[in-house]
């Protein structure tokens, strides 16, 4: 028995050492970038937010070892990834791209086994481009699956679906102008769809405290579903598109959304928000670059 206990102890120690070796050193987190304060700064200007490219929509994996983002090349958005391997960050690698279709708004499922995105690709990937749907590819041992899978009719409509994020239980938040008329085609609303028994359920629109007759899209929901941050185009905004935030009340209702103010918003266009899994940083896009700021800015708006 003593011998078995000793062997078991050695296994535990070895396993712990293995995990310690695979963790990212604190200084190397976030692509080795110096951390921001309460004022947003451009993220990785030497590697991601380049002057001659238009970058937007970004997400880190929960373990911090993968960074996905969209970049426009020759007028066509593509999705790239930078990974932490062998104690260093790799060069950006194209995950999915096309000369015919657009691919953007990457976001990982809560378990990291799926990479979701939007695309105007045809159903079989060969015909003419169509409206934007939400699609995903699945993680394999050596990378990602080759053929995108449509997220299905509970999510996608005859019109456009944009940008998605997830609660820890797998509920998807996204935006769509599905069901609108030609006169209200720009009226995108934020929706949610629970994930149950291997499929997404019928969507629900968020209340009028979030959705209006204006454009609301690019929604990030906190994993505990206690707040949403989204882009809206409203007359009272500071720019063409601003980030707004709505907190959930103690009774489970979404409170009236607030403009996140001049700390975040400018006369430009702010969109594609994302908060890192450690809760430390808010990422968002502005006029062709990716920015980040301390997530403490969220608490100042409660």
Label each PLM-derived region with a short phrase.
Residues 1-23:
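Bacterial Sec-dependent N-terminal signal peptides
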Residues 21-302:
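Short, conserved micro-motifs composed of acidic
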């Amino acid at each position: 028995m003593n011998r078995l206990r000793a062997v078991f102890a050695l296994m535990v120690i070895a396993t712990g050492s293995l995990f310690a070796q695979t963790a990212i050193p604190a200084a190397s987190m976030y692509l080795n970038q110096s951390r921001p304060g309460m004022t947003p700064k451009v993220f990785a200007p030497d590697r991601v937010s380049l002057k001659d490219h238009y970058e937007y929509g970004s997400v880190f994996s929960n373990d911090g070892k993968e960074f996905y983002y969209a970049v426009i090349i020759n007028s066509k958005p593509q999705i790239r990834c930078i990974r932490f391997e062998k104690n260093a960050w790799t060069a950006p690698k194209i995950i999915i791209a096309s000369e015919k279709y657009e691919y953007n708004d990457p976001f990982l499922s809560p378990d990291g086994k799926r990479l979701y995105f939007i695309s105007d690709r045809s159903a079989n990937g060969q015909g003419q481009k169509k409206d934007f749907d939400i699609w995903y590819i699945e993680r394999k041992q050596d990378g990602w699956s080759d053929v995108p899978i449509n997220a299905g009719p509970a999510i996608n409509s005859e019109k456009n679906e944009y940008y998605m994020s997830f609660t820890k239980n797998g509920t998807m938040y996204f935006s769509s102008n599905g069901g609108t008329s030609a006169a209200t085609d720009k009226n995108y609303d934020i929706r949610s769809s629970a994930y149950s028994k291997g499929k997404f359920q019928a969507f629900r629109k968020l209340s009028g405290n979030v959705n209006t007759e204006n454009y609301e899209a690019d929604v990030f929901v906190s994993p505990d579903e206690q707040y949403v941050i989204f882009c809206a185009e409203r007359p009272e905004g500071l720019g063409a598109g601003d980030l707004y935030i709505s907190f959930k009340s103690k009774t489970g209702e979404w409170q009236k959304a607030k403009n996140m103010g001049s700390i975040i918003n400018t006369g430009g266009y702010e969109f594609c928000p994302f908060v890192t899994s450690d809760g430390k940083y808010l990422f968002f896009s502005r006029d062709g670059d990716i920015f980040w700021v301390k997530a403490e800015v969220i608490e100042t708006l409660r």
